[in-house]
Amino acid sequence: MRSSAPYHFGSPVGPEHFADREPELALLAGRMIGGISVIVHAPRRFGKTSLVRRGLLAAEAAGAGVGYANLLRCSTRREAAQTVVRAIFAGPLHRRDLLRRLGGLLERIRVRPTVEVATDGRVQLGFDPALADRDWGGAMGDACRILAEEAGRRPVALALDEFQQVAEIDAGLAGVFKAMLDEAPSVSFVLAGSHLHLMERLTTLPGAPLLGMGELLRLGPIPEPAMTAYLVRQSRRAGRPMDEAAARLVSALAGPVPNDVQRLAQSAFDTADAVIDAGCVERGMELAVSRQSATFAERYERLSGTAQRLLRLLAEGPVARPYARAVMTGLEVANDNAVRKALAALTFAELAVRTGGAWHVADPFLRRWLVSGAD
């Protein structure tokens, strides 16, 4: 049966929706198998998690033991330790004899985890929330020493996604993770993050605690020819072919973020009866905006008046000099501090981003909503 959803957005994509990134995938999988750590920097919705997961699958297929931990929901050291230790035992250490070996392994972790065994034999570890003041960094280090022993038998890779959250938990936690990497030099750690200013502070700026701890991989936009070929190919498989001009228009209106391109492509597909042309793309943009209009309105209403006016200004076109007198006059503010606060609020809410030396609205659908004055 032909698919009614040839494109995918909103969550990490599987192999069938993976558009390009083959060179990055080959590099990442090779480093995982080779025991070399990698630091992945990517703006949000650029396919970071999809790439990392595909790299883990490729490394596992080549015989590596792999694990994946998402730190986004961690707000304390205990939660970070629980997430990392769980990933280690559920991934690289999960072998047929794990249950037999489990007691001895857990004795080596200075904070004893709780243990649950699922019906399929999967082991779920945790730390009691009542245990407040414990050496959580030491517990992670203990687990990493066990992981290093496993790396003596086969390649081992552990991906720590949304790694920027480490900076939000506390100032010293990045040093704990550096010690972890030092404890297991033969393990490939993949530190992947999307808030670039935080990731740079953790990994690449002078004095960063994790500076030089892995090979840097920066994800940029998918090249337009590769994205066009993907859009056309997917539409043909689903029985509503998109012509190349329409595919290029999708990228022009929604790019450069792959997630946004796929969202618009799917909306254009939804409006088409047979062939997807430029008219379908324009109607698809209107449809995508209307589907998100309530969310846009809620986010807009939470902003201060100055931030609202600045966001509308950015929707009209990129602004290279936001502190210029003409900009402040248009925003009806008396000094650049008000502009600075508004930009900080828009950046924190991920509504505005600075690329190519200028500020602009981060979301193409929000930009269209602002320009059209939609309710």
Where are each of the predicted segments found?
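P-loop NTPase nucleotide-binding core
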Residues: 37, 42-46, 50-156
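Short amphipathic alpha-helical interaction segments
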Residues: 331-348
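Conserved Walker B catalytic segment
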Residues: 126-195, 204-206
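Short, amphipathic alpha-helical interaction segments positioned at domain boundaries
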Residues: 365-375
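Helix-loop-helix "sensor" segment of P-loop NTPases
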Residues: 200-252, 273-275
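A short, conserved structural fragment
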Residues: 347-357
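Winged-helix-like regulatory helical subdomains adjacent to P-loop NTPase cores
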Residues: 262-334
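A short, basic N-terminal segment
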Residues: 1-38, 43
